[in-house]
Amino acid sequence: MRRLRLFETVRMTAAGIAVAGALGVALAGGAFAEPTPPSIAVIDPGAKADTVAEPDSYRTDEYRKPVPATLKGAKVVSAEEASALWSNGSAVFIDVYPHAPKPPNLPAGTVWREPQHFSIENAKWLANVGYGVLSAETENYLKRHLERLSGGDKAKPLLFFCLRNCWMSWNTAKRALSYGYTNVLWFAEGTDAWQEIGQPIAELKPEP
């Protein structure tokens, strides 16, 4: 088990887009559909979760901004509650951190190194499902894996997370509710709080 600060770097693409961070990478941009890599943004330090209202629909931009304290229909869990669920194996942990694909048309001879992603040990990484607008292909990917991970049981506890102040986990938890899942858990503080309480992390690969 590895206990380290999450540090990930994604190589600059030919178009000049970079994704970087210590799992504190900024997930922002305009109202775009995935899988456009997110751009760098700064979290507003003045806003607080209890002042952020729940939107009627999904967040489609500025994904690294303070999130609401609630998600209607879901249960918000603390790091300690998430730890207890993880220890007894009573919930499926689903990481929705975005994954930057290999840039197309790389110059000949360029070596592409897949960026490492460290997350909660034994979690399932469903990459790029947290954007506000999903392609039909990505939404089908999400539905298929939720069906698989829940074993077809709509009451199976599903815990969604990303980073602290990351709307992608909020979006995905909201989508799961719209699909009829009734035991949706939102770990809003994500891997940041997980590490702060000394819980283990491990390298994950996206679910195919």
Task: Go through each PLM region and give its residues.
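Rhodanese-like catalytic fold shared by cysteine-dependent sulfurtransferases
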Residues: 2-15, 19, 25-76, 85-88, ...
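Short hydrophobic beta-strand that contains or immediately precedes a catalytic carboxylate
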Residues: 82, 90-97
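Surface-exposed acidic loop/strand-edge motifs in secreted or periplasmic proteins
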Residues: 96-100, 105
